[in-house]
Amino acid sequence: MSEREQMKLDMVKNLALMLLEREPQLSMEQALATVLNSDTYQRLLRDSTGLYHQSPQYVYAFLESELLTGRSE
C-alpha cells in the first residue's frame, strides 16, 4: 500500500469518527457507509483534489455540507 493510499484510508477513518462524535446514535458501520457513499469520498479518492493532504476537520466540512444540503460543493 502506498503512502497516499494509507493517508486516504486514515482520512476515511477520521471522517467516520468525527461523524460518530456529532451523531452518536449512528453505529460505526453506518458512519463508514455514510462516508464511503458520499461525493466527498469520491473527491478524496481523486489525487488531483489533494484532499488527502488536508486536515480531517477541513474535509469533514465538505462532508457535513453535503449531508446537510444533499450535494457536494
Mark where each language-model region is.
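C-terminal alpha-helical interaction appendages
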Residues: 1-73
